[in-house]
UniProtKB/Swiss-Prot annotation:
Sequence repeat spans: 123-199, 217-293
InterPro entries: Cyclin-like_dom, Cyclin-like_sf, TFIIB, TFIIB_CS, TFIIB_cyclin, Znf_TFIIB
UniProt entry keywords in alphabetical sequence: Metal-binding, Nucleus, Repeat, Transcription, Transcription regulation, Zinc, Zinc-finger
Zinc finger (TFIIB-type): 10-41
Record protein name field: Transcription initiation factor IIB
Nucleus listed as a keyword: yes
A Pfam family annotated for this UniProt entry: TFIIB
Family annotation (CDD domains): CYCLIN_TFIIB_rpt1 (cd20551), CYCLIN_TFIIB_rpt2 (cd20552)
Keyword Zinc in record: yes
Single GO term (MF): TBP-class protein binding
Amino acid sequence: MASTSRLDNNKVCCYAHPESPLIEDYRAGDMICSECGLVVGDRVIDVGSEWRTFSNEKSGVDPSRVGGPENPLLSGGDLSTIIGPGTGSASFDAFGAPKYQNRRTMSSSDRSLISAFKEISSMADRINLPKTIVDRANNLFKQVHDGKNLKGRSNDAKASACLYIACRQEGVPRTFKEICAVSKISKKEIGRCFKLTLKALETSVDLITTADFMCRFCANLDLPNMVQRAATHIAKKAVEMDIVPGRSPISVAAAAIYMASQASEHKRSQKEIGDIAGVADVTIRQSYKLMYPHAAKLFPEDFKFTTPIDQLPQM
């Protein structure tokens, strides 16, 4: 009985028409008496499903009851003040256009972050990187931005370096030249910013190896698996035998692809490989020259030669 009394006490009703049903206006958040129109409750929460608004809908009513998703990386929780349209003459400028409609106030820090996040997303789209890498790059940029350790470096340079680091950390490394191709920053500046970012965040990245690039390079060159496996084996053996000391993994991978392709029927030129790997022809030749005298030891035993080793190009 006591329970029933408590329920009765908590019941919302019109004081003039307690028995009249109430109309719930979820858009306004009000409960209205159906008899006299009195608002007897406000701030009603709609527990129904959310609606989306599409740009081609002609109705002026927006069924959405919430704004865009919050971004936890922004300092203000992604909340900002929006000034709606006014009704008085002071709300319009000399040309009759609304002065303040949809004007948004946002901190300079958040504006800087949003601009950098857009740049990271744009670069990632152009080289087909997944959202997981974009999210990691955004987090790295946020840490650098909050730490204020890279003063004097442009946001574009920091964004490019963070995207490069994110690729390395996610196990899908890209070369500096690939990042530079979709960035507004020079390769040299990205390299500098990369080192400064690692130092500022007190983090590290795994060393890149020839295997990190082999699959992608061979796929872009339209080479079959047989050539890819041979090139991977050649590059790995060359490193293990210390044939190419001081050479970058990218140049070793490119030279190994050149050697494997020249021994098969799927031959690729130094220029074709260089364009894909982002290295100069002379760089490929220098690594190939070191590897050629040991070619017999570098190829896998089951490789089917179309061109014998003694007929391979000599530099």
